[in-house]
Amino acid sequence: METSSSGITNGRTRVFHPVAKDVNILFDELEAVNSPCKDDDSLLHPGNLTSTSDDASRLEAGGETVPEKNKLNGLYFRDGKCRIDYILVYRKSNPQMEKREVFERNIRAEGLQMEKESSLINSDIIFVKLHAPWEVLGRYAEQMNVRMPFRRKIYYLPRRYKFMSRIDKQISRFRRWLPKKPMRLDKETLPDLEENDCYTAPFSQQRIHHFIIHNKDTFFNNATRSRIVHHILQRIKYEEGKNKIGLNRLLTNGSYEAAFPLHEGSYRSKNSIRTHGAVNHRHLLYECWASWGVWYKYQPLDLVRRYFGEKIGLYFAWLGWYTGMLFPAAFIGLFVFLYGVITLDHCQVSKEVCQATDIIMCPVCDKYCPFMRLSDSCVYAKVTHLFDNGATVFFAVFMAVWATVFLEFWKRRRAVIAYDWDLIDWEEEEEEIRPQFEAKYSKKERMNPISGKPEPYQAFADKCSRLIVSASGIFFMICVVIAAVFGIVIYRVVTVSTFAAFKWALIRNNSQVATTGTAVCINFCIIMLLNVLYEKVALLLTNLEQPRTESEWENSFTLKMFLFQFVNLNSSTFYIAFFLGRFTGHPGAYLRLINRWRLEECHPSGCLIDLCMQMGIIMVLKQTWNNFMELGYPLIQNWWTRRKVRQEHGPERKISFPQWEKDYNLQPMNAYGLFDEYLEMILQFGFTTIFVAAFPLAPLLALLNNIIEIRLDAYKFVTQWRRPLASRAKDIGIWYGILEGIGILSVITNAFVIAITSDFIPRLVYAYKYGPCAGQGEAGQKCMVGYVNASLSVFRISDFENRSEPESDGSEFSGTPLKYCRYRDYRDPPHSLVPYGYTLQFWHVLAARLAFIIVFEHLVFCIKHLISYLIPDLPKDLRDRMRREKYLIQEMMYEAELERLQKERKERKKNGKAHHNEWP
């Protein structure tokens, strides 16, 4: 193979490059060497770096040594040289002292350094500071296959790019006169927030000279150091026995009270970041990500990943992608709503309702509800048109396609992120068995087919029996939800009569709206109360199943909680959409609950207004409550902790707490990790897609909420929570499958909402079959003349049941008692051969509804599958970059190995120990 005979020296490292076989290389060899990748402190302002090698001369000249400075910031040991990588917290009064002593003795045996400090607030609390020296980091980084940078990436660019680059240079001259992109972070006044692209490889101590190491203290960033220390702690014994191992078990049995990595100092600074730079990465994250002043800017995902790890970085990447994709959905939804506003004055149906002063409607409840003119519901007819108009069907199809496009392009976006963050070839380590599983099944063992070691085993019969009990518990809780919905239904049918007899005319005349509004608020309270119960039941059932590993436990718990909360949140919405007013009977023969309460009817303008109110109120209240609990609850708890400290030590005494004590007083991350954050967004995604045909403004509300949600979550992670352990993940896990399921369900529900809940199909049938334009192939507004009258049936008042007969005889309308009233249905008049039987128009409408559901579902599903087929999971340029990177890495590894062998041969010749080798 043809190789380069000369190398380029950069500092301590002599780098050899393979000969490029194509001249179209973006970065030449000299640039590749002179522009090395950045270390952990390179994102900060040069004047604020805390590295000992960088700051020694500057600080000593000012009379202050580096160790003295490091002692003050609370991030180092007492000597000011060893950085704190992990904190353990326990109480001296805890009886598990023997286990801690064995555990800490083994920690020192692994090479970790340790110091202990008492709390300034409570002397019973002890902080154990842990530091991993370079030798320990290198040894375990090699075991964990931690990928580290060793060469700047070299991109292949086609010849066409040369011509395009010249054009871009000309365009860039004019761009200087244009305003800068407001959504991008200002990289001129702030430090560069993105890493330079570097080739990475699993760290190897034998090939350490090939990695880009400017400073051993910052080669492994703080998140990686903490992850390595946590990995060590999970494999240290605290007692004799094969299962007495790991920090998690000590946290479970109370030996340690807390364990966490440190934040990198304060998130605030007296000086502006634009003039003095960032004090630390936490400060940089706060200013560029968690501050409300940057709510409109893109997220610095690379910095989030460096500080919190890939798992949390992927969550914010997904949340940002979801929020960005909501922009077109919100715009189209707003357009549908505005289209209804613009066409409101031209809507023939609304005109006929508002002008129908001579049409008297039958009472909507027993006795107390009066007769009413159809024109009294003019406002509701206009509001219904805002959401149920000609653009609704288009919007439903658009949202179904949007959900597919969102998921397909997220797969592509995830692939790019996985490539940039070195997650393509990453595989999770073999998971440890849960301590609860080991304790339960320690007497039964079998050989693990992967590790070849004996492990506890759960019999198939035992597993099936537990799953059956768990499924029964899930079914019972779903029945509880249905019972709660049934209670809301009874409330609605009972309250509508009460409001109809109310003294206040405003409530009496709007009894149905008042009933719906109060029922929705009560339903929201029930939802929030049941959510607390569901969490405890889901936890109980998941522990009953005895999952083997933490990921199995997490997946099982996630499915249960999602199922419970989804049913809890949407059950009343499903009732209003598909059951309200569908099975009420007709005047003179009403259907009743337990032969007592008459089922609730829809408003004369239809049931869609009830569905809109349900979705709007629930969505606004739930998002407001979630945002308050996410930020307000930690703020209140942290304020209460500070208040207790001031009361114990006096408000006039100012205590300077070290960083470990400040972090200990913050709230720990949720016990379920990112579960609550994902669940909130997934339920919102369901609300945005499942009933979007009835509420086109749902995407807009979701967009506004998510813009706030991103900054709330960022603020919470940076300022209110302890720093979570930096974990790795390749994707969003089981949530992607749930999103796909919601996308499929949304197609079905929107088809039924359009066909059954809205009046789209009845209007269509009337226009083409019964209206003035019947048989002419037209369906404009002029073809809807007479639709309202055709959609109402006639009832003879003397046919009322005794318990349904209203107290009023309707003489207030014409001066004489009414003989007939109208109601929404397609039935024959009382004097026909079959009184109150279904008309032919009813069967035509029913057939059209069923046909629409079938056609809509098949059409949309075909479009979804076509889009999924046409959009590849990996972008073509990314696929080419991956293949080229693999090729170049092989070449560079070959060069490195060849260099090592040649060096060894020269040394053997020099020492006079040369012997024959066939290669090289």
UniProtKB/Swiss-Prot annotation:
Gene Ontology MF terms in the entry: intracellularly calcium-gated chloride channel activity; protein dimerization activity
Keyword field: Cell membrane, Glycoprotein, Lipid transport, Membrane, Transmembrane, Transmembrane helix, Transport
Keyword Ribonucleoprotein: no
Record function comment: Has calcium-dependent phospholipid scramblase activity; scrambles phosphatidylserine, phosphatidylcholine and galactosylceramide. Does not exhibit calcium-activated chloride channel (CaCC) activity.
Organism in which the protein naturally occurs: Bos taurus
Lineage: Eukaryota, Metazoa, Chordata, Craniata, Vertebrata
GO biological process: chloride transmembrane transport; lipid transport
Similarity annotation: Belongs to the anoctamin family.
Protein's recorded name: Anoctamin-4
Reaction catalyzed: a 1,2-diacyl-sn-glycero-3-phospho-L-serine(in) = a 1,2-diacyl-sn-glycero-3-phospho-L-serine(out); a beta-D-galactosyl-(1<->1')-N-acylsphing-4-enine(out) = a beta-D-galactosyl-(1<->1')-N-acylsphing-4-enine(in); a 1,2-diacyl-sn-glycero-3-phosphocholine(in) = a 1,2-diacyl-sn-glycero-3-phosphocholine(out)
Residue ranges, Extracellular side: 345-389, 492-512, 582-680, 755-850
Note: The term 'anoctamin' was coined because these channels are anion selective and have eight (OCT) transmembrane segments. There is some dissatisfaction in the field with the Ano nomenclature because it is not certain that all the members of this family are anion channels or have the 8-transmembrane topology.
Record: glycosylation sites: 509, 789, 802
One cellular component term from this protein's GO annotations in UniProt: plasma membrane
PANTHER family: ANOCTAMIN, ANOCTAMIN-4
Region (Disordered): 38-64
Topological domains, Cytoplasmic: 1-323, 411-470, 534-560, 702-733, 872-920
Coarse class of the protein's main subcellular location: membrane
Record field: transmembrane: 324-344, 390-410, 471-491, 513-533, 561-581, 681-701, 734-754, 851-871
Subcellular location: Cell membrane
Topology within the bilayer: Multi-pass membrane protein
